[in-house]
Amino acid sequence: MDFALSDNQKNIIATFREFGESVFTPESVFQWRKDQGLPDEVVKGFVDRYFALDDQSPDGMGIMSQALILEELCRCAGAALPFQNDLFNLQIMGGFADETVSSRVLDDYRQTGRLMFSLGVSEPNAGSDTMSMTTSV
């Protein structure tokens, strides 16, 4: 098994390392915590970089590429929210939404940097308590 990163993955790391180091300064993170959110220009900067790389990638942004992005943002800022939720919600949407819905949501995300997404969970004997869910094989 080859665990070496591809040139594309190295480019993703470099791009988001530069973004994280330039944007997630201790002063900025402190202010955003006080404001209880990230400014529009920060989330839009993230989304612009994400989709620019996604458009260049032959296979698009898979879960491994998304994990590398989150790792870099955590390295710079100590956390990756809200981007972590956005990226994993994109994975869910890609797997289950029809093309019409998916395309509309992605277009809006590209334009605004804000992903309007919610995930409902309901399981027999657990309801929405995801920690109480059980599976069997």
Label each region the model flagged:
Residues M1-Q84, R104:
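Amphipathic, small/basic residue-rich leader segments at the start of a protein or domain
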Residues L81-T100, G127-D129:
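N-terminal glycine-rich flavin-associated loop
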Residues G78-Q91, T112-G120:
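FAD-binding core of FAD-dependent oxidoreductases
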Residues W32-D35, G94, S122:
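Glycine- and other small-residue-rich loops at beta-strand/loop junctions that grip anionic moieties
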Residues E72, G95, Y109:
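Conserved catalytic core of Hanks-type protein kinase domains
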Residues D59, T100-V137:
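Glycine-rich, Trp-frequent "lid" loop and neighboring beta-strands that shape
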Residues V47-D48, A97-D98, T134:
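Short alpha-helix boundary/capping motifs
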